[in-house]
């Protein structure tokens, strides 16, 4: 099974070696036919503490690192 790759924005970089990334998803509601935005937060491994709040990053699914972390940063998309 291929590993998922998502793109989002860093919303918190306060923890050591961990950043919180918000990934926004849009879809059309099946009943009301309105475009709906859903945001989900992911705990992402950042071993060198390179990323700050507001950075856009691309993340990839990986093996579990802790109870909540199973994602790594693969690319910095700028600000």
UniProtKB/Swiss-Prot annotation:
It holds the Pfam family Ribosomal_S17. One of its GO terms (biological process) is translation. The keyword Ribosomal protein applies. One of the primary rRNA binding proteins, it binds specifically to the 5'-end of 16S ribosomal RNA. Part of the 30S ribosomal subunit. NCBIfam families: PRK05610.1, uS17_bact. This is Small ribosomal subunit protein uS17.
């Amino acid at each position: 099974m291929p590993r998922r790759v998502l793109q989002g924005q860093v919303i918190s970089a306060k923890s050591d070696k961990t950043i919180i990334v918000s990934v926004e998803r849009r879809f059309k509601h099946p009943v009301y036919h309105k475009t709906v935005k859903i945001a989900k937060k992911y705990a992402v491994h950042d071993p060198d503490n390179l990323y700050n709040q507001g950075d856009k990053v691309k993340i990839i699914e990986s093996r579990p690192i802790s109870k909540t972390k199973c994602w790594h940063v693969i690319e910095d998309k700028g600000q």
